Amino acid sequence: MAFAITQNCCNDASCLSVCPVNCIHPTPDEPDFGKTDLLYIDPRSCIDCGACADACPVDAITRVSRLSPSQAIYAELNADYYRDRPVDHAWGAPTFPPADIGSVSLKRVAVVGTGPAACYTATALLRQTDAAVTFFDKLPVPGGLARYGVAPDHTSTRRIGEHFRSLFVHSRVTMRLGVEVGVDVTVEELSRTFDAVVYAVGADQDRQLPLESEVVPMSARTLVGWYTGHPDVPADAVDLRGVTRVVVIGNGNVALDAARILTAPVEDLVGTDISAHALAALRDSAVREVTVLGRRGPEVAAFTRSECQALVDRTSVPVLVAGDDDLSSVLAALPLSASAAPLATAPRADEAETGDGATRIVFSFGRAPVAVRPGALDVRGSGTSDAGIASSIPADLVLQATGYRGSALPGLPFDADRGTVRNVEGRVVDSEDRPVAGAYVVGWAKRGATGGIGDNKLDAERTVELMLADSLSAATSSRRETAGRRPLFGRAGR
């Protein structure tokens, strides 16, 4: 009996290297990697050894015979991925680090940030060099989005933090927490002190919405920080008093997280890492309906299939779809692997009706937000049957979950159009695309706010490969002797 990869797959790919028969795909060398919700196990080739389950940092791999009824679909999804793919999975040529440890001149490296991208970068550096790594983070505790961006009821995904715990106490790692680069220490000071600096600062701003109203929606980023206990988000940042209907603009995974948390039975959240103030507010919450609003159709929904499936499978809160027969036909025609495929069996909803008072989640597609006004969100149809038709959705609270972008760090080149650190494949470059000596970037700050936790592993490893290549070729112009340097914060320590 084979194993199957389930909902909370992080695409970390730790399972790939331990599989003795190469039956887990797509691999980082294959075109589909980073484009699928999950990695998939070929049930025809799996030898049932369980090595992948032991290696998975988020417990996403389970023996098919032990899948719960709600997880049974993942046996089918794993098998479906290989339906038109070869059974014989050839091994690729082995790859090795580009240099011997002793020949790499990187002795002191700073990593700005402590989220997954930062941690994968440090892991690769510690494995391939003898460099000492210093983490900088403005927050008093490490973890980044793995700590403050993963929903508290996603307990398995949050275990990725445990995966990195040993890294923070590694003998060659120094932690500088509560130190904000650009405020407490400058980019220039880091450049003078370290052989290389890797910026893993993420994306901390919302993408702008072209709304016609002066009223702006609440950022879903604020809601997420509120229920995860982010130090920068006050306990009173979200006020649910008098709120019965919520509209979330956007239909990515963050939107689904917001809808799920706001409608969850409180007993489902007790015992999770949810903040105490959020739990108290949700216990008294009167929210009865959350509408997840998408400008385009379900065939291009931004959420992942696994998150949608989990929402539909939740028996405590019904999921409905607002739309006509045309929408029903579109949903019915979606392939099994499509993000919105689980909605094909969801009942239709009339947004003008509040139902019997029971809590519910409503998906609404093909409607663009126009303006927020007291008690409602004005929208305009963008589908084939209602293009340009204006309407409104009742809403006591409107949330914006339309994606994130980075903000400029003083002294570091910034691409305002993309909302990222200005870079070419991870090398920081100036306005004329010339490499900035010793400066690199990983994660969302490098490629934009796309991809999950595991996507940052391959991203970080590729940037580290560039660092090693630059070190060997002397492309970095800062080969200063460390003996004459003065530490930024006195003696090294944690």
Language-model features, listed with the residues they occupy:
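Iron-sulfur cluster-binding cysteine motifs and their immediate structural context
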Residues: 14-34, 38, 51-68
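FAD-site-proximal beta/loop scaffold in flavoenzymes
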Residues: 16, 33, 216-235, 387-447
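Glycine-rich dinucleotide-binding loop and its adjacent helix/turn
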Residues: 75-98, 206-284, 419-429
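N-terminal Rossmann-like FAD-binding beta1-loop-alpha1 element of flavoenzymes
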Residues: 108-130, 255-262
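Dinucleotide-binding/catalytic capping subdomain of oxidoreductase cores
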Residues: 142, 260-385
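C-terminal, flexible cofactor-proximal segment of oxidoreductases
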Residues: 427-494
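Glycine-/small-residue-rich beta->alpha transition segments that form the dinucleotide
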Residues: 195-196, 200-207, 221-224, 251-253, ...
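N-terminal Rossmann-like dinucleotide/flavin-binding domain of flavoprotein oxidoreductases
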Residues: 142-196, 341-357, 362
